[in-house]
């Protein structure tokens, strides 16, 4: 059977679907926290994204504790509890093989805050207002015709 070269293309539908299933299972396991390390028990952890490798053997889990405090400590604790979390994912998701879990800091909130700060800068706000006024003027001209 011939394999396709997928370099340059995004994740497959299967990778996206399995990633979402793993994300839900992991978030549920972290929310319940039944068998977790006591240091993690009181921490609320969000899992906004899980990216699967093409062979579905590795799940890269992007996590962020609520409030963004002690991120590195939380990631180290999650990595230390990886075997237990993997078992919890296996109980909740029916897969041929359970992926290995890797934990990384989620930077999407930081990126969103950075973009928001850029849009609030006076020079950018001025440019946006100028574009809005120009668009409104062109619509008025079209209506008069």
Curated annotation (Swiss-Prot):
Q: Does the keyword Cytoplasm belong to this entry?
A: yes
User: A Gene Ontology MF term for this entry?
Assistant: ribosomal small subunit binding
Q: Where is the protein situated, by its record's location annotation?
A: Cytoplasm
GO BP terms: namely:
maturation of SSU-rRNA
Task: Enumerate the UniProt keywords alphabetically.
Answer: Cytoplasm, Ribosome biogenesis
Compositional bias of kind Acidic residues: 130-145
Q: According to its UniProt record, what is one Pfam family this protein matches?
A: RBFA
Q: Which InterPro entries match?
A: KH_dom-like_a/b (IPR015946), RbfA (IPR000238), RbfA_dom_sf (IPR023799), Ribosome-bd_factorA_CS (IPR020053)
Q: Name one GO cellular component term.
A: cytosol
Region described as Disordered: spans on this chain: 126-145
For this UniProt entry, what is the primary localization, expressed as one broad class?
A: cytoplasm
Whom does it interact with, and what assembly results? Monomer. Binds 30S ribosomal subunits, but not 50S ribosomal subunits or 70S ribosomes.
Name the HAMAP family on file: RbfA (MF_00003)
The role this protein plays is: One of several proteins that assist in the late maturation steps of the functional core of the 30S ribosomal subunit. Associates with free 30S ribosomal subunits (but not with 30S subunits that are part of 70S ribosomes or polysomes). Required for efficient processing of 16S rRNA. May interact with the 5'-terminal helix region of 16S rRNA.
Give the record's family classification. Answer: Belongs to the RbfA family.
> Could you tell me what this protein is called?
Ribosome-binding factor A
Organism name: Azorhizobium caulinodans (strain ATCC 43989 / DSM 5975 / JCM 20966 / LMG 6465 / NBRC 14845 / NCIMB 13405 / ORS 571)
Q: What is the lineage of its organism?
A: Bacteria, Pseudomonadati, Pseudomonadota, Alphaproteobacteria, Hyphomicrobiales
Name of the gene: rbfA
